[in-house]
């Protein structure tokens, strides 16, 4: 639900807990 996690997920995965990949960036729920 919240905006960008400050992480990109061009490779398809996010390392930051609670973040999911909304290509090409990670977003929080």
UniProtKB/Swiss-Prot annotation:
This is Varv peptide D. This is a cyclic peptide. One of its GO terms (biological process) is defense response. Belongs to the cyclotide family. Moebius subfamily. InterPro entries: Cyclotide (IPR005535), Cyclotide_moebius_CS (IPR012324), Cyclotide_sf (IPR036146). Keywords: Disulfide bond, Knottin, Plant defense. Pfam families: Cyclotide (PF03784). The keyword Disulfide bond applies. There is a cross-link at residues 1-29 (Cyclopeptide (Gly-Asn)). PROSITE patterns: CYCLOTIDE (PS51052), CYCLOTIDE_MOEBIUS (PS60009). The presence of a 'disulfide through disulfide knot' structurally defines this protein as a knottin. Probably participates in a plant defense mechanism. Disulfide bonds join 5-19, 9-21, 14-26. It comes from Viola arvensis (European field pansy).
